[in-house]
Curated annotation (Swiss-Prot):
This is Lon protease homolog 2, peroxisomal. Gene3D superfamilies: 1.10.8.60, 1.20.5.5270, 1.20.58.1480, 3.30.230.10, LON domain-like, P-loop containing nucleotide triphosphate hydrolases. ATP binds at G486, P487, P488, G489, T490, G491, K492, T493. Its EC number is 3.4.21.53. PROSITE patterns: LON_N, LON_PROTEOLYTIC. It catalyses: Hydrolysis of proteins in presence of ATP. ATP-dependent serine protease that mediates the selective degradation of misfolded and unassembled polypeptides in the peroxisomal matrix. Necessary for type 2 peroxisome targeting signal (PTS2)-containing protein processing and facilitates peroxisome matrix protein import. Pfam families: AAA, Lon_C, Lon_lid, LON_substr_bdg. InterPro entries: AAA+_ATPase, ATPase_AAA_core, Lon_bac/euk-typ, Lon_lid, Lon_proteolytic, Lon_Prtase, Lon_prtase_N, Lon_prtase_N_sf.
């Protein structure tokens, strides 16, 4: 391997990326990303420069390639390519330059000088290094934070020999180098769109080769070895060749193989080595036109180091590769079972592809188009798990994954039942069709053999009519288009996954939030550069079947009409069960059947969904979870999930129902359970710290897995939300109303306070009230003023109760916005309580809208309001009669703990609040009841 009588020195070492070798006189780009060793090395070199220990204009270090399992540590070839043991190969492939060990490094390397840093837009930076001098590693001094070793440098001039054999090898090197450059100059025959070697660059190569003498033979060998693009092992052997003769032999062998490979690829057998002198042009007109085109392509391949088949490190014949690609594409199209329209288009494009020059830009466009057609699942479907246990299995799956949500579960089970019945009906029809077809085939065989009809003409016509009738009775599977509407965190997305699991179908999620270009839905037309199919077709390609479950997430956040089109309008065809069997993507431009796809869309609000799009979907509303439902979800799903996520085992964190309820009501106020899961995660992490400390200190018996109510403030901080509790004593002008929070899923009681004072009839409203709530106060006051005589508030029907009096109506928690008409009944009762001096029992709460006629009208959020009332300690609740149906959704424990009274008129509510009181207008109560 040459003399080792070089100078020993300490040198920082940088492992090169896999497959890279730096030779003297050659430049190499080293990626900087994910290389902590390189960053530490550059930082240390910069510190030395600042301290004056190093010239800041020259930064050098050793560039060491990774070892190869095919070579010994001295660069000797051990075994042939391809026969290496699989375990060794996998071990070698897994080596990362940034995490390399000293055992992974090659014995030889090159001193590299940093000549610059390159970084293109939106790309990782590269360190540009130029090879200076070979060295041998004696031993590694350290591995971290960067490699450093003691190396022996080798002087190139010491290896120069002027014997006749070396001179002959040098002449062969120059001749083969000129010949290769001449062949590479033929790249100018290629179209302008292809990769080509500039004649100016080729001319500079020729000048450099011509000026090189024997003293620079080693540099020329290193340079041409890099140009010839050998295999990784061949580069390592060149690097390990310190002796000039050995190096020349190996490089001459590489160049000869490269030149001969280019010649053989175009079948030019009459051209000898002497035919390519640098001063005589190559006569391309003497070659057959077909071979001329192939030569141009082969020369382009020569830029990357083409070698003939069978040679070490060689590549397959490019023409055969292109032919194999087209044949493989044709095979894929045949296996795809295309529709008749798709088959017609694919055959036409395939014929065009075979006639096209691969160097043509349209070749890649056409091939990509055919590959997309082949990837679409035209007929391949997933067999649904539809059997006697289908509904039971699906019900168990949905109940296991989600608590509550009975409405959506019911609708999905209905779909499964219909699908099961359709399949049974189709199976019966198929059996009848098979029997009739068999009978007709038998009759045709008799007619063909004996020339005598086995059936009369009338019987044959009758059988064919029955066959056509049966074929028309086949039930098509048109999947519904479901729209799940509800607040965030209520399980809409996970519910769609459960549907796919229960059906046994593949699942794909398409996020529509922020989509503003119609082409993202329906694809780009092929005339555009880099055109591709839309989200729908790409989803089908990804799942590989024609009947998946598609989740169209956040469909309410699709962008509206703009200069790029209207994405929501593009969804009309996708989500129309009558049209999506012939959906046309702009890129594919062939009808695609989407009728077997089960589309489930999700939205937080219906306000931003266009009416035509909304009309095509079946809307199912998911209300927020109640406190009771959240407790069940936390105990069944969230707490076990967080215990596992934080490295704890079952039983190492115990939360009682009271603790969970406290977290729900005092630390979260949301419709879903996302924030609840975060808070439970904080509790589990707190207990994980305690458990880890107990284990580390050997005092595991002191660890208490139980989380008490008093621990919550230390873990989660002070309570973020205060819960209203029913008063123990009533006072005039104060009434308990019911409220459902706008976040959904939670309700509570709301105290309404009314006070009067001397004034001019003015009414002041405070508590951050909305316009609707203010109007309900005005309606309540108008009704009380109109019936003040019947209520015993005045002695004369014409007397104004507000004369010389002003009112102030206040709703506590003034920082929280409040709106809605549901407090009308509570406002009316509060005004009557203030004017009569009768206190409202604190255990009574009420909700309902009031009209000027005194009718109590229905309101929303009954379920949440009743749960909040039960939690606050209310015993009796007054509800509008028309809300009786809504009470069916209330949990049984809440229903049993409340006395629910339904009222239709204010007079009925008055009698329920003050049952023993006598009113001057008592006869009006009886009159109203008789009218109702």
């Amino acid at each position: 391997m040459g003399s080792n009588n070089g100078r020993a020195m300490k040198l920082a070492l940088v492992p090169l990326p896999k497959g890279s070798v730096l030779l003297p006189g050659v430049t190499l780009r080293i990626p900087v990303s994910n290389r902590p060793d390189l960053a530490n090395l550059l930082s240390a070199l910069l510190d030395q420069t600042n301290l004056g220990k190093r010239d800041g204009n020259t930064i050098t270090f050793g560039c060491v390639p990774l070892r190869s399992p095919l070579l010994s540590n001295d660069g000797q070839q051990l075994i042939d390519d391809g026969s290496v043991d699989g375990a060794k190969k996998e071990e070698f492939d897994a080596i990362d330059a940034g995490q390399a060990r000293k055992e992974d490094l090659f014995r030889y390397g090159t001193v590299g000088k940093v000549i610059g840093v390159q970084r293109r837009a939106y790309a990782e930076p590269f360190l540009v290094v130029q090879g200076v001098q070979r060295f041998t590693i004696k031993h590694i001094l350290r591995e971290r934070p960067f490699f450093e070793g003691e190396v022996v440098l080798h002087n190139e001039r010491d290896a120069i020999s002027s014997d006749a054999e070396t001179v002959e090898l040098f002449q062969q090197l120059r001749q083969l180098s000129r010949e290769l450059i001449t062949l590479l100059r033929l790249s100018s025959l290629l179209p302008s769109t292809g990769t080509r070697l500039s004649p100016l660059v080729a001319r500079k190569f020729e000048v450099y080769i011509a000026k090189t003498d024997l003293s620079q033979a080693g540099n020329l060998a290193d340079f041409m070895a890099d140009v010839a693009d050998p295999t990784f092992e061949e580069k390592l052997r060149v690097l390990a060749s310190f002796a000039l003769r050995t190096r020349l032999e190996r490089v001459v062998e590489l160049l000869a193989r490269q030149v001969q490979g280019i010649k053989n690829s175009v079948k030019v057998t009459t051209i000898s080595t002497s035919s390519f002198p640098s001063n005589s042009p190559f006569d391309i007109s003497q070659i057959d036109p077909r071979d001329r085109e192939l030569l141009a392509r082969r020369v382009m391949a020569g830029l990357t180091g083409l070698t003939p088949p069978g040679a070490a490190g060689g590549r397959n014949n490019e023409d055969e590769k292109e032919t194999n690609e087209v044949d493989e594409l044709q095979k894929r199209l045949q296996e795809a079972e295309l529709s008749p329209e798709a088959r017609k288009v694919a055959d036409k494009e395939l014929r065009r592809l075979r006639k096209m020059n691969p160097a043509n830009a349209e070749y890649g466009v056409c091939r990509t188009y055919l590959e997309n057609i082949a990837d679409i699942p035209w007929t391949k479907v997933t067999e649904d798990k539809l059997g006697p246990e289908t509904l039971k299995r699906a019900r168990n799956q949905l109940d296991e994954d989600h608590y509550g949500l009975e409405t959506i579960k019911k609708r999905l089970l209905e779909y499964l039942a219909v699908l099961r019945l359709k399949q049974s009906t189709n199976q019966d029809v198929e059996r009848q069709i098979a029997a009739l077809t068999k009978e007709l085939d038998a009759a045709n065989e008799v007619l063909a053999e004996k020339d005598v009809p086995a059936l009369s003409e009338s019987d044959r016509v009758s059988l064919e009519a029955k066959l056509n009738l049966l074929q028309s009775r086949r039930l098509a599977d048109k999947s519904p288009i479901l729209l799940l509407v509800g607040p965030p965190g209520t399980g809409k997305t996970s519910l769609a996954r459960s549907v796919a699991t229960s059906l046994g179908r593949k699942f794909h999620r398409i996020s529509l939030g922020g989509v503003r270009d119609e082409a993202e839905i329906r694809g780009h037309r092929r005339t555009y550069v880099a055109a591709m199919p839309g989200l729908i077709v790409n989803g089908l390609k990804k799942v590989g079947v024609a009947n998946p479950v598609f989740l169209l997430d956040e469909i309410d956040k699709v962008g509206g009409a703009n200069f790029q089109g209207d994405p929501s309008a593009a969804m009309l065809e996708v989500l129309d069960p009558e049209q999506n069997s012939t959906f046309v993507d702009h890129y594919i431009n062939i009808p695609i059947d989407l009728s077997k796809v089960l589309f489930i869309a999700t939205a937080n609000s219906l306000d931003t969904i266009p009416a035509p799009l909304l009309d095509r979907m079946e809307t199912i509303t998911l209300s927020g979870y109640t406190t009771v439902e959240k407790r069940h979800i936390a105990k069944r799903h969230l707490i076990p999930k967080q215990i596992r996520a934080n490295g704890l085992a079952e039983g190492q964190v115990v939360l009682s129902d009271e603790v969970v309820d406290k977290v729900i009501t005092s630390y979260t106020r949301e419709s879903g359970v996302r924030n609840l899961e975060r808070e439970l995660g904080s509790i589990c992490r707190h207990k994980a710290v305690q458990y880890a400390d107990a284990v580390d200190n050997g005092r595991l018996d002191t660890y208490n897995p139980v989380v008490a109510l008093g621990d919550l403030e230390d873990i989660l901080g002070i309570e973020r939300f205060d819960e209203e509790i029913a008063e123990k004593h009533g006072r005039p002008g104060v009434v308990t109303g019911l409220v459902a929070y706008s976040t959904g899923g939670q309700g509570s009681i709301l105290f309404i306070e009314v006070a009067d004072m001397p004034g001019n009839g003015r009414v002041q409203l405070t508590g951050k009230l909305g316009d609707v709530l203010k109007e309900s106060v005005e309606v309540a006051l108008t009704w009380v003023k109109a019936h003040s005589f019947e209520l015993g508030l005045t002695h004369d029907p014409n007397e104004d109760i507000m004369k010389n009096r002003s009112l102030h109506v206040h709703c506590p928690a003034g920082a929280i916005p409040k709106d809605g008409p549901s407090a009308g009944l509570a406002h009316t009762i509060g005004l009557i309580s203030l004017f009569t001096g009768k206190a409202v029992p604190p255990q009574i709460a009420m909700t309902g809208e009031v009209s000027l006629r005194g009718r109590v009208m229905p309101v929303g959020g009954i379920k949440e309001k009743l749960i909040g009332a039960h939690r606050a300690g209310v015993k009796t609740v007054l509800l509008p009669e028309q809300n009786r149906k809504d009470v069916k959704d209330v949990p049984q424990e809440v229903h049993d703990g409340l006395q629910i009274v339904y009222v239709r008129h204010i007079w009925e509510a008055i009698r329920q609040v003050w049952p023993g009181a006598h009113w001057p207008g008592q006869h009006h109560i009886n009159f109203v009841e008789s009218r109702l």
